[in-house]
Amino acid sequence: MADANSIADAWAQVHGEAKPEEGGVGQWIWEAIQGDFNENRTAGQITADMVISLIPIVDTICDIRDLCANIRTYRKDPDNKLTLFFIALTVVGFFPEIGSVIKGVVKIIFVYVRRYLKRAEDLLDATKLGRATNAALDAALPKIAQFLSESRVVKWATKEGVPDIFRFCAKHLDELAAKVDAGKLKAKFDEGVEAAQTLLGRIKYIVPGSTRDKLDDFLTFVGQQKNKIGDAIGQFTQPIRTILKLTAKRLDDHAWIAFTQTHNKGWIAPMSQQGA
């Protein structure tokens, strides 16, 4: 992982902010990790967050930020299975095979799934999970389309010779779904925790004492609960696969709709099942 100053340089570049003075770098990164995660982000903020995540180093710190946020929520209510499920969703971002573009799509849909999935029991009910996922996709598809139209994504797709970005994403999401299993979720959770421990361990020596105490307390909790959480998230393999497969199908459907619209100017294709 890059050092604290490299991360600060990248973050400042993205946000257009001056890099803080040397003594404030650790505090700045700590505040970014604990403060920037917001479940109630606007649609514009979600898309901007995904574009920011395309930048190396910032991508890593965004993953760490989201993982830390979910672990803090788990600490408040360790019996809440939905929180464990959201940790499992976050862990998918640590799968290296998906790349930054696919990860951006995955994160957008997961943000919306959180809004529409309200009961842990629904994870075990295929009908209710499918209904919640499709509602989330109705809301998320315009944002996914916006993200995939961003200049950084377009430049990447052009460079890589990707003819249809929607079909490309659909194919890779299907492949990702097949790779999700309990063992891999635990392994990637462990990697994510280690990345968080490494970053926070580096900055704790350059933050004020009061912040260091909070940081040490969080690191202690993570160390104590790491194995328990890692074992528990394996139960969500099937729900995650379902969400990824439904997303892949909707993106593939949208690719076909867009193709049809191009060849039939008299019909306007809907972005969602509701025609929105």
Describe these PLM feature segments:
Residues 1-276:
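Long, low-complexity, intrinsically disordered regions
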